[in-house]
Amino acid sequence: MSQSPAHEGDRNAGALIAAVCICGPALVSLIGMAPAAALPAMAKHFDQNGDGAIIAQNIRTLPSIALIVASPISGFLGERFGRRNVLLASWALYVISGAAGLFAADAFSLVISRLILGAAGGALLTTSLALIGDYFGGHTRERVLGFGVAFASLVAAGALTAGGALVDAFGWRAPFALYLSGLPALIAAWFVIHPPHHTRTEENAAKAATGDWAPILRLWPLYALLVLSTIGMYTPAIQGPFLLSEQSAMSATAQGAIIAASSIVAIFAAALYGYIRRVLGLTSVLALVMASFGIGIMAMAGLPGAEKIFGSAIIGIGAGCAEATIASAIFLKSPDHVHGRALGLLVSALFLGQWLNPWVFAPVREAAGLSNAFWIIGAAFVVLCTALVAYRLVRGEKLDGPARSVS
């Protein structure tokens, strides 16, 4: 069972601030999910330029590159200049660059707008998570993290389903209109979010300037596990449409519904995360995450037709717990004054895995076919689950516990 520092148990800023904080992770999920159902149509549109499938997949995942770079920078800027300022600026860029996909004239302009969107999303997600750490503590913080992932999964499921319908009705550009939903979130953040502790912000800024990276470097195993987790959790959205198109004839709406099953299950898994953590330690939860990815990915390959929805749903168990688990571990294992940068690297790891997904699958698909690639990569996750279980049995729940003090 997790043990949080006693002083954190009383830190609870209330439901309104929690709601605004979790809007960031929720709408950042649109960066990858909004155009997911449009991938086959987008691939046909760009097929004359070369390999339409890889072009479409990379237009979907290219924001990850900017996000990977921008997230640690935004964490540092938040520590130096205040998280509220970074949050508001990132919301404005999110709305403008996201909706630009409605009008982009060619692949190049679409790529530029998607890169800007990725940078805005990285700053938005990093700052939102850091604000959760500022405003909440202990099990309350873990519940807020879980609810944030749940809301993100709800938005992602809605985006996948609505995106498929929009593609069928209006073409592949239509899902980019979903990014306009960031405008009311920007307005709400303007009125609700204010620095909770002015003196703490100033202290953090001074410490950030000293280049104190040692507590962050110790977290590298957590970042590596999150990269692998993200490869698994995004498999239905990135590879699923192509697997479904290869194995059966389905409309974009039907494909979107099957892929959305992962996000729907993730909603419930994430909403229950705070309760799961009262029973299971972090290593045990990570083993559960890897098992769900492995079994779910293999089930998507092995089950026929619409029954693939069960594989997608199993993947949702891990998708609902992975991000909150790693974030909880980082809050516990790093001191307050590095949380901005530590969470920035968390976001970088999260989207590095998303960007790597097509490149991990590509050589396996070329060598063995897409269906066999699902089997092979799914089996690799099962092996990783077994390794985590063995580690848990030998070493115990070493990830649980408060951060070590750093002078």
How would you name each of these model-derived features?
Residues L16-D47, P236-P241:
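Extracytoplasmic
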Residues L39-I68:
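Extracellular/periplasmic helix-loop-helix junction of adjacent transmembrane segments
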Residues I68-A107:
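Conserved MFS/SLC helix-loop-helix module at the cytosolic interface between two early adjacent transmembrane helices
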Residues A70-G82, A269-G281, R365:
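Helix-to-loop junctions at the C-terminal end of transmembrane segments
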Residues S113-A152:
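Cytoplasmic helix-loop-helix junction between adjacent transmembrane helices
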Residues H139, F147-H194:
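Helix-loop-helix hairpin linking two adjacent transmembrane segments in secondary transporters
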Residues L219-A260:
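Extracytoplasmic gate region of multi-pass secondary transporters
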Residues K333-L370:
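A late C-terminal transmembrane helix in Major Facilitator Superfamily
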